[in-house]
Amino acid sequence: MGFAEFAGNQRVVTALQGMLTADRVPHAMLFSGPRGVGKYTLAVMFAQAANCARRKDDFCGECEPCRRIGLLAEPAPLVEQGLAQRGESADAAMVERVPLILQTHPDVWSIVPDPMRLRNPVARPVLHMGQLRAVARAANFKPTARRRVFILDGAETMRWDLANIFLKILEEPPESATLILLAPNPYLLLSTIRSRCLQFYFAPLSTEQLEEILKRRTQFKPSERKLAAQLAEGSPGRAMHMDLEGAAQLRRDVLQVLERAVEGRSYAQLFDATAQLVKGQKESFENVLEVFYIVITDLLELAYGSTDRPLRDPALRQELGAVCKKIDLEWVAQAVDGLDELHGRLRRNINRQLGLDAVAISLARR
């Protein structure tokens, strides 16, 4: 056990170990990079190393602090447990009074966006005021072990008017506490928060690195490992947990929307395709948009790229080739701009169906 188990981004691991060895741990860090690249995993590992009873610059994984903190590595069951304890009928006031906090050790908290949707079924999970206030209070408590660590996953989801609560912690940092913010894009956070954090960017892994990880940690066949590595966009977490059959269906559904748009089908047929895509997928809407980017990248590569460069999804080469004959660079640019705008508006809890319909209409050939 230890940091040696972490795959990729060794420069970040080395920097964290150096901090622990020198006993110069910052009061706040910001981990940014693609979803599933290992930000949360390494944050939990750091919390283990900061409180390990046997080691100083690493963690053993066997002592009581390591084992208890390690339970945070799989947050989904803890989230379900927390929601069940709070009750399904919780109103907005209850959500603030009983904030969702994942805690398996007194000194380490994991704060994740609260999935309680209340009366809005399309609302994105966000960090709530109650969660931030709880962190502000607890950060000043003395640790029972060596260091208090607060992991804020999805830090970009906190409303900017609530960020001032968090900013006060950064302006008056406790001596024995470290806050680790996780966000896909650091610029989704206020500049005043970014400037007070030591920032680390987690780069996507290469396809070869992902295939090696999948070979060691999954039961995927060689062909499945290759496909998962190509579609994971450098994310080991996404590759290891990929439902290949579901991912294949999602890509077909996305391609169907683009096919109907470029073929000039009726708006009724186009909207049927977008409705099927939004309602029929178990994945997050953000992931659906990412698949749009992947398919469009393959279209661009097939139409204008090198012929010997592999597609991300070679199984759809024939269908992609048919679409390529009906598009140009202007269409590709318009598609990317529309997806970028839709992705940016997700923070405002817009209607996803209407947003995707608008993008599809803008791409329709008439």
Residues of each region from the PLM?
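Charged, glycine-rich active-site and insertion segments that engage polyanionic ligands
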Residues: 1-49, 53-57, 65-68, 98, ...
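Residues immediately C-terminal
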Residues: 157-158, 172, 188
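Clamp-loader machinery-focused feature within the broader ASCE/P-loop NTPase space
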Residues: 2-161
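Structural recognition of the conserved hydrophobic beta-strand(s) that form the central parallel beta-sheet
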Residues: 149-153, 166, 177-183
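Conserved strand-to-helix beginnings and helix N-cap segments that scaffold or border functional pockets
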Residues: 160-164, 286
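Conserved catalytic/switch belt of AAA+ P-loop NTPases
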Residues: 140, 164-178
